[in-house]
C-alpha cells in the first residue's frame, strides 16, 4: 500500500506499548470480563471472548488468571462492572484521538484523561467533536507470513461483505500485515468465518480508522505526542487509542 497507512498507529498491545507487564494483564483481564458478560462465558459460543482469550495467550497471561476472569464475569462483583466508554480529544499538533476505555467509574476516567491531555496542550472534547474524522469499522489482522494465499483471504473476505483487504508494513517492525476491514455490524460474522478458514488472527477489534492522515514533522511536537501517548496508554482504564497522525 503506497503512502502513509491508515493502520500505521493501530495498537494491538505489544510489549513496547505497555511499560508494565502487570498493567498489560490488567487490561487483558478487563476485556475478558466484559466479553464474557456480553455473551455466554464460553469462547466456543462467544467470538469476542474467544478473541480476548487469544490476545491474552499471546501476551502469556496465565491460564488460571484467564479462567478466574471468566468466572468473575458470572458473579456480581461491583468492581468488575466495567462499561465501554469512548472519549474524544485533541492532542499536540491538533491530532485527533479516539480513546477506548473499560471503566467502572466514568467520572474518574474522564478527569484523568482531561488532565493528561491538558498537560500536553490538548483537550477532551464532547461526543462527536472528533469522531467525524474517523470511520468506525471492524478490523481483523493477519501476519502475511501466516497466510499461504492472499487471493484466498481476499476472495473470502469480499464474499463476507468485507469493505476492504489491505496489505501494509508495520512502521516499527517492517513486518508485512493484511488488514481486513468490515462494517461494525458484520464484525462478529466476518471474524468467525475467517477464524474457521484461517484460524487465529494476529488481532481483531473495533477500530476508529482515520479518514485522512495528519503528517507531523516538527520534532518538538513529535516529542509531546509521544509523551502524551505514553501517559494515556499507562492509564489502566485505557484499552486502545486510535489516532490520525504519522511522524515524518
UniProtKB/Swiss-Prot annotation:
This is Probable transcriptional regulatory protein Ecaj_0351. GO terms for molecular function: DNA binding. Residues 1-21 are annotated as: Disordered. Its main location: cytoplasm. GO terms for biological process: regulation of DNA-templated transcription. The lineage of its organism: Bacteria, Pseudomonadati, Pseudomonadota, Alphaproteobacteria, Rickettsiales. Belongs to the TACO1 family. Pfam families: TACO1_YebC_N, Transcrip_reg. Keywords: Cytoplasm, DNA-binding, Transcription, Transcription regulation. GO terms for cellular component: cytoplasm. It is found in: Cytoplasm.
Amino acid at each position: 500500500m503506497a503512502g502513509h497507512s491508515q493502520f500505521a498507529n493501530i495498537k494491538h498491545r505489544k510489549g513496547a506499548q505497555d511499560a508494565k507487564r502487570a498493567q498489560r494483564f490488567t487490561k487483558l483481564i478487563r476485556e475478558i470480563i466484559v466479553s464474557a458478560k456480553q455473551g455466554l462465558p464460553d469462547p466456543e459460543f462467544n467470538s469476542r471472548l474467544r478473541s480476548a482469550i487469544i490476545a491474552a495467550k499471546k501476551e502469556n497471561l496465565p491460564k488460571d488468571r484467564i479462567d478466574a476472569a471468566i468466572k468473575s464475569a458470572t458473579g456480581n462483583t461491583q468492581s468488575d462492572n466495567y462499561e465501554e466508554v469512548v472519549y474524544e480529544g485533541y492532542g499536540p499538533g491538533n491530532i485527533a484521538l479516539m480513546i477506548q476505555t473499560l471503566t467502572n467509574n466514568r467520572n474518574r476516567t474522564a478527569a484523568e484523561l482531561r488532565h493528561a491531555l491538558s498537560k500536553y496542550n490538548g483537550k477532551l472534547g464532547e461526543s462527536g467533536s472528533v469522531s467525524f474524522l474517523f470511520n468506525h469499522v471492524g478490523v481483523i489482522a493477519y501476519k502475511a507470513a501466516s497466510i499461504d494465499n492472499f487471493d484466498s483471504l481476499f476472495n473470502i473476505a469480499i464474499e463476507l461483505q468485507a469493505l476492504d483487504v489491505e496489505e501494509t508494513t508495520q512502521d516499527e517492525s517492517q513486518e508485512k500485515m493484511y488488514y481486513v476491514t468490515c462494517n461494525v455490524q458484520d464484525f462478529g460474522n466476518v471474524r468467525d468465518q475467517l477464524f474457521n478458514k484461517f484460524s487465529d488472527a494476529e488481532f481483531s477489534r473495533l477500530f476508529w480508522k482515520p479518514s485522512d492522515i495528519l503528517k507531523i514533522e516538527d520534532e518538538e511536537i513529535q516529542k509531546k505526542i509521544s509523551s502524551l501517548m505514553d501517559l494515556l496508554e499507562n492509564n489502566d482504564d485505557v484499552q486502545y487509542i486510535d489516532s490520525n497522525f504519522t511522524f515524518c
